[in-house]
């Protein structure tokens, strides 16, 4: 029997330290809910998890961006709904004015007065108080041609990574930009915009714009607004599907990241209980090991 080196006590102390360390790690994981709290816990898992977290947060922001894009489109489309309503009324008035057999100059003047007010409400894009001038989203004027094709684009970042964007154009929807369109070039016919409508000319023997021409102006304007609303509706539908896809991708990626980083509480609690029992047993055995050298005294009596 040796008393200078108590090997049994040293072995038991090492096991006690190991069990206490394991218990502390168990408690750390249980209190944080994570099985990776530092790089030393799982270096590769931490790197993968952090990359996934960046992607998840990017997907969440992309979804918010798409929602903001829908809000912008709804703002523009709502304004165009009113523009449509105005143009339908203008068409009705042009048809009424075309009944020159029962209209005199006073009647045509009254009709033109209402048309002029309606056209003014559409706005001429010059910044005055019309729908095309005051329709804006976060300071961006949407219907004055600022984002027409070939001018500028509204860019929506709808993905978590680069090159995942959606560019949108909104043509000018002002009274100077809406009207009769050349069937060949697709351009607005000069002098035949909604702003040029003047039904008082119907009283003249040779009006500069005949009834047929002025009706074509309104019909062309209605078609232009319809086309723009259709394009905006298509973009809105796309963004809604984008949001659904981003949500599904984020959900799946979150589940994958959780499997890497989150702790299994039941399993970890079992490990903690085991290590705690082993620690208590080690303490008891250490006391026994420390008692063994005392037995040497029995030999010295």
Model-predicted regions and their roles:
Residues 1-301:
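Primary detection of the long, small/polar-rich alpha-helical "axial" segments characteristic
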């Amino acid at each position: 029997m040796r008393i200078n080196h108590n090997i049994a006590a040293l072995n038991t102390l090492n096991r006690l330290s190991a069990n206490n360390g394991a218990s502390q790690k168990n408690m750390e994981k249980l209190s944080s809910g994570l099985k990776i709290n530092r790089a030393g816990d799982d270096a590769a898992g931490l790197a993968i998890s952090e990359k996934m977290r960046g992607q998840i947060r990017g997907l969440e922001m992309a979804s918010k961006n798409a929602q903001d894009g829908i809000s912008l489109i709804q703002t523009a489309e709502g304004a165009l709904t009113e523009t449509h309503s105005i143009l339908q009324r203008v068409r009705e008035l042009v048809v009424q004015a075309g009944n020159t057999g029962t209209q005199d100059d006073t009647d045509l003047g009254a009709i033109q007065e209402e048309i002029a007010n309606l056209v003014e409400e559409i706005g001429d894009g010059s910044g005055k108080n019309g729908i095309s001038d005051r329709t804006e989203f976060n300071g961006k004027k949407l219907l004055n041609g600022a984002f027409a094709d070939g001018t500028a684009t509204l860019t929506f970042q709808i993905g978590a990574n680069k090159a995942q964007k959606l560019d949108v154009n909104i043509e000018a929807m002002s009274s100077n930009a809406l009207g009769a369109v050349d069937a060949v070039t697709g351009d607005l016919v000069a002098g035949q915009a909604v702003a040029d409508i003047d039904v008082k000319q119907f009283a003249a023997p040779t009006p500069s714009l005949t009834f047929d021409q002025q009706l074509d102006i309104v019909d062309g304007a209605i078609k232009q607004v319809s086309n723009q609303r259709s394009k905006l509706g298509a973009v809105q539908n796309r963004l809604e599907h984008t949001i659904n896809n981003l949500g599904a991708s984020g959900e799946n990626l979150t589940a994958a990241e959780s499997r890497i980083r989150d702790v299994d509480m039941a399993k970890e609690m079992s490990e903690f209980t085991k290590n705690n029992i082993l620690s208590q047993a080690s303490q008891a055995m250490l006391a026994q090991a420390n008692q063994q050298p005392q037995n040497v005294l029995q030999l010295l009596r």
